Amino acid sequence: MKLTTLQTLKKGFTLIELMIVIAIIAILATIAIPSYQNYTKKAAVSELLQASAPYKADVELCVYSTNETTSCTGGKNGIAADIKTAKGYVASVITQSGGITVKGNGTLANMEYILQAKGNAAAGVTWTTTCKGTDASLFPANFCGSVTK
């Protein structure tokens, strides 16, 4: 009779059960952490792409008003001044001769996003996209090297 009462008082987890749970958590963490880090870098790349948007519109207006790309430089012909001070993931945005170069900062320090305008007022403007850096795969698929209107 006393034996059954002792067995009912034993509650909790054994050391083996706790070690198995810890091992499972460790395995899941080794899979999840690299995926999360890659995801955050991809989100940061979108900041590089967004930084070029206002300059892209300015360069197009410049091309339509001057009929060439060579005079489309930051701070001239209606184009916003270049950004030379780092802010967030963007180190700088430089516009020169119709080209827009966005350099990354922080975890994206080795990355560059380059847009080059070609065309004139009659033909319109086309953009060639170039992505540089060791993590260029973080840019959207079929994005780098594309030509868009």
UniProtKB/Swiss-Prot annotation:
The keyword Transcription regulation does not apply. Residues 1-12 form a propeptide. Pfam families: N_methyl. The keyword Transmembrane applies. It is found in: Fimbrium; Membrane. GO terms for cellular component: membrane; type IV pilus. Coiled coil: none annotated. The modification N-methylphenylalanine is found at residue 13. It is a single-pass membrane protein. Keywords: Fimbrium, Membrane, Methylation, Transmembrane, Transmembrane helix. It comes from the Bacteria. Belongs to the N-Me-Phe pilin family. This is Prepilin peptidase-dependent protein D homolog. It comes from Haemophilus influenzae (strain ATCC 51907 / DSM 11121 / KW20 / Rd).
